[in-house]
Amino acid sequence: GLCALLSALAKQPIYQHLAVTGAVDQFGNVQPVGGLNEKIEGFFRVCSIQGLNGKQGVVIPESNQLQLILSDEVIEAVKNGQFHIYPVSHVEEAVELLMGCPAGSIDDDQTLFGRIRERLDDLNGSAGRNGLFSTLFRRLHSLVGLA
C-alpha cells in the first residue's frame, strides 16, 4: 500500500516485473511477514508461466531471509539470474528497486520525495515551498528520520 501511494503521489510508475511483500513501521523500517515462502513460490509460478526473462523477482523484508525454504526450482532460477529475491530493511531501498528512482531528498526534484513535494505544492496551488501540503510533508519527512 505505501509504495503504491508514493508512486501515485510522485506520478512514478511501479515496475510490473517485481512483487513486494512486507510491513512498514512509522519510521519506514520494513518488518517481517508470514507466508513468505508461499508468496515467493506463487509469484515465481506466475512468472514461469509467462516466461522468465531475468528481470522478475520479489522484494522481501531483510529480517525474513533466514525463514526462506524455497523449492529447488526457485533456488536454481535465482542462481542462474532468471529470478531475483531482494531483501530490504527500509522503504527507501524498496522504492528504488520498485520504481528505479532514488527516494532521496525532498529538495531534489530528481528523487521520489522531491517529486512528491513538487506534486503536493502543485495540488496546493503553491509554487513556493510554504504550502500546506509541502510543509506537512517536510515535517513528516523529518519526523521519520528521512531528512
Per-region residue spans from a language model:
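Peripheral, non-AAA+ core regions of ATP-driven protein-machinery
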Residues: G1-A147
